[in-house]
A protein has these predicted regions:
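Acidic catalytic patch
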Residues: 21, 47-49, 71-98
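Short beta-strand scaffold positions
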Residues: 10, 44-45, 84, 104, ...
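Short active-site oxyanion
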Residues: 38-43, 80-81, 115-119
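Acidic, PIN/NYN-like endoribonuclease modules and their adjacent C-terminal/linker elements
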Residues: 1-7, 110-137
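Alpha-helix capping/helix-boundary segments
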Residues: 14, 49, 89, 108-109, ...
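Active-site-proximal, substrate-binding regions of enzyme catalytic domains
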Residues: 54, 58-80
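Short, well-structured N-terminal submotif of metal-dependent ribonuclease cores
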Residues: 1-45, 61-68, 126
């Protein structure tokens, strides 16, 4: 059995180009996603890439709503070849972003605060309910 091809860090554009059949990079990007899905390749997906994808894909007409974007991103994160740090927290943040109407950065900070027990320091009290907020009164 041969070892999977190590792709390194996976950039946002791979996941965007793979959505558009008329894009010149579509075939290669789809092939890379297929290799990640079947485990013949591995790559790291950083939280910054997830953030950028939530931003870009929400502004394009490819997906009807945030929940559809979340399903696409969760599908990629579930691929055997996709590696990421702190997957449970990343998935929690993605779920909050999709269902609560908050920005991904706020969803990520809240999920991290809940996972680590650390407080949030923010003027924005609305999006950080449930965790201590150390912003001075």
């Amino acid at each position: 059995m041969t070892a999977p091809v190590a792709l390194g860090y996976l950039d946002t554009n791979l996941f965007v180009h793979a959505l558009y059949p008329n894009d010149p990079h579509y075939p290669r990007c789809r092939a890379l996603l297929a290799a990640l899905a079947d485990g013949t390749a591995t790559g790291w997906r950083d939280v910054v890439v997830v953030y950028e994808l939530t931003f870009i894909l929400a502004r394009r007409r490819r997906f009807p709503d945030r929940e559809a974007i979340e399903r696409y991103l969760r599908g990629i994160l579930a691929a055997p070849g996709v590696r990421t740090e702190d997957r449970p927290t990343l998935l929690a943040a993605l779920g909050r972003w999709a269902t609560r109407g908050v920005g991904f950065a706020d969803a990520w900070l809240l999920a991290r605060a809940e996972a680590t027990g650390r407080p949030i320091c923010s003027v924005n009290e609305r999006d950080f309910g449930g965790v201590p907020n150390t912003f001075p009164a």
